[in-house]
Amino acid sequence: MADLTPGARKPAPAELTGFRSALAHTGIPHGVLLWKPRLPSRNWLVFWSVSLSLSYAYYYDRAECKRIKQEVVERVEKYGREPMPGGSLGEPRRVVVWAGRWGGDDDADRAGRYFRKYVKPYLVAAGIDYTLPSVPLHGSITRQLHAAILLQRRQALGLAPTATPLSLPGVLDPAEAKRREVESGVVVVGRASLKEYLEGLRRGWECGVDEWAWETEVEKTLAGDGVFESVESPVEPAVETAETVVEPTADAVPKSNFGFLARPAPVTPGAPAIPAHLHTPPSPLPPTPPLLLLPFTNHLGFLQLPYMILDFFNERAKVRQGAQSALALIEGPTRDMHREDAEHWEEKSESWYNKTARQLPERLQKSRTEYYEAIKSRIDLARAYENGDREMTEEEKKANKVERIQDIQAERLKKELRWKGSEEGWEIVKPETPATWRDRWEGWLKVYQVPEDAQKGL
């Protein structure tokens, strides 16, 4: 038989008073009207505190970035509205940007993107153009600058032909173009770029005026290393007898009106030696563009991850630095560059080179060793085919192509250009190598300064 004993009665709901009693007739549940807020648990408090703090830090940082950028763009827009020299056919001011490779980074354009993100917007607003040469390897800035200065010196001495000026509207004569180039300025991104730039100046002005091309120099070095020389058994020369000697007859001489083409070409005289006094650099040195030193540090690797996170929430520091650098290039005065600037500017940034960067010579040597071991069999196969000692394989017949010695030589030259260029460039930019400096450069090299109001107002 079922137990019909009544159980414990539920407590009566709390009585609603005040405005709650009026809201009860609107259909709002009784529990909602009696709900009392309480603090969440400790874990939820920690979660919401961290989330809101990080969100506000991100919002504040990006708001400051937007404010700084807008303020500087409005400040320099007036320069972009000024009439261009030469009218509609004139050219705007054009600066050269040297953005060298960061050690250990596979991306060669990292410094270039830094310039385009943090400095370029203000130059565009001010109507200033820029040129960003390609620098795929360590030392590319040095080699390009060396070649440009060498060409300039050879043309000034009459050792190289000069371009014929065109008498067309809007085309500047060489003297005016050089003057505007000096007035435009040069942007150097990071300490590695500064080291390469100064070394390029030294080589260009101190290494003589002999004709020079880096690719040709490397090619000549590789030509005599014996990698592609074949090892063949010596063949004894045949002994000529009276019966074997055949005298040429008149009938054997080709009778043709083009017989002169078979004659050996006359030996052309070698280039005359350049007098020793022409190798001496001019004194004083020709004017050179002022430098804008743009700091740049690139964090790489797992160990530097905390600094990457800090940079993410402190983007305004980079925006402010880029804005100040742009104002220095647009409005700032110039001062003489001193030895201390070359030796100590951004010296701390070199401490951020990771293990991959510092092991670059060992990695290049390992790649070179493995490559030369791998091409030995390829050279033997190519030489055997060219000598007629083997036929085409099935794969070669399907591809309708046989690898020849010339193909391997061209491939090897490309790799050696990259290896030798990287090795030479790393010797210039590695932290143990001091920046190049000459006492005679005092007063010749100049750097842009940030305007005083921009140092405190941004």
Swiss-Prot record:
One of its GO terms (cellular component) is intracellular membrane-bounded organelle. Residues 1-43 are mitochondrial matrix. One of its GO terms (biological process) is protein transport. It is found in: Mitochondrion inner membrane. The chain crosses the membrane at residues 44-60. Keywords: Membrane, Mitochondrion, Mitochondrion inner membrane, Protein transport, Translocation, Transmembrane, Transmembrane helix, Transport. Residues 61-458 are mitochondrial intermembrane. Pfam families: Tim54. It comes from the Eukaryota. It is a single-pass membrane protein. Belongs to the TIM54 family. Component of the TIM22 complex, whose core is composed of TIM22 and TIM54, associated with the 70 kDa heterohexamer composed of TIM9 and TIM10 (or TIM8 and TIM13). Essential component of the TIM22 complex, a complex that mediates the import and insertion of multi-pass transmembrane proteins into the mitochondrial inner membrane. The TIM22 complex forms a twin-pore translocase that uses the membrane potential as external driving force. This is Mitochondrial import inner membrane translocase subunit TIM54.
